[in-house]
Amino acid sequence: DQPVQRITDELTVFTTTDEWRANHVVIALPPALAVHAIELPKSLPNELVDIASRTPVWMGDSVKVVACYSEPFWRTEGFAGAAMSRRGPLAEIHDMSGPAGEPATLFGFARAAWMHAGIETDIREQLTRMFGPRAGAPIELLIQDWSQEKWTAAPNTGRSPEYGLFGDPYYRQPTLDGRLHWSSTETAQAFAGHIEGALEAAERTSTAILGDRLTSTETSPRSGLN
């Protein structure tokens, strides 16, 4: 359970204390994070590395907020619990309560640029403005700034995102003779950045690897990692 530090052209994977020889390597990190955090094989095409470094991380510039309540009062008051806002700080809000209303929660997303000492007050004021006084007094207000997370925020967080790079054809073609696979949600052609995109990428990758296994029984001479 260690972060990968280096992957060689021969598909030897180095962590802090160990090394593994693999038949296949799957990069499940967002491409920009992989390029930033891992010394990748030197033989990778320069264009692929450039595209990977510029591909946005879906949550890399986001703040997630969850407001918890004793009951989903907005339902009994005739509100859907869903809202969009250009004023903010939350650009979108959704009802995250269970089917029976427990736990009773609203959640939303804001841009990381909104993070400052007074963001909690700003959020409470927005909830009051949109759903009434009870919304502005949650039992608990949870705020997660993903832009400060090492394995979520890429170095390019904050610049104009190039969403057109999601699902780029380079990601769908395994490199190093079909043995190095890009498999994060950002590599999907549909629903990139979402769970559905991650499932698409996983299906594409597993099909590529299992197809190779059908014609080869080779196992790793060092560790059995495939």
Task: Go through the PLM ranges and name each one.
Residues 5, 32-33, 148:
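Residue-level marker for beta-strand->alpha-helix junctions and adjacent short loops that shape enzyme
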Residues 15-79:
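Central helical "cap/lid" subdomain
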Residues 1-12:
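A conserved short coil-to-beta-strand element within the FAD-binding core of flavoproteins
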Residues 6, 36, 190:
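Active-site environment of divalent metal-dependent phosphoester hydrolases
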Residues 10-12, 61, 77-226:
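Conserved flavin/dinucleotide-binding core of flavoenzymes
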